[in-house]
């Protein structure tokens, strides 16, 4: 059993190299974002005192389910800034989705809607509680935005859902947003 601090550090590093900087660990992702688990294991072993079993434990116990491990290959489920194709299928969203952010972002969002910024998609939550957890990672006061996903979908916008249940959209125009979801 590895210490929680090391587990967190290894998990964050895995997210970093599998989503943003595979070169930093000497890895090459395929077009779908996959890399050989053996290659990742070697890269992690050169930086951390961690076993194959401990890496698997990190993947399986990650509360956010950030990774998928299949057929001796691994990838991050979403949040990439490197160019990959997750081969996501379109899905009909629930009536409402939610986005947690900091209050300081509200002026920009109110003018321009939610943009994907450096990522491939805007990340949305299926419930207010998850959005609150996301918002808590931001500095300052937090707000939870409600997305009228049913209307957005009916008006031709596409939604996708990742392997770990995060809803994804290219953008969320301002007319589909309201600020009163679970916040004062």
Swiss-Prot record:
The keyword Nucleotide-binding does not apply. Its EC number is 2.7.1.-. It comes from Rhizobium johnstonii (strain DSM 114642 / LMG 32736 / 3841). HAMAP family: KptA (MF_00299). GO terms for biological process: tRNA splicing, via endonucleolytic cleavage and ligation. Gene3D superfamilies: 3.20.170.30, RNA 2'-phosphotransferase, Tpt1/KptA family, N-terminal domain (1.10.10.970). Signal peptide: none annotated. It holds the Pfam family PTS_2-RNA. InterPro entries: Ptrans_KptA/Tpt1, RNA_2'-PTrans_C, RNA_2'-PTrans_KptA, RNA_2'-PTrans_N. This is Probable RNA 2'-phosphotransferase. The lineage of its organism: Bacteria, Pseudomonadati, Pseudomonadota, Alphaproteobacteria, Hyphomicrobiales. It comes from the Bacteria.
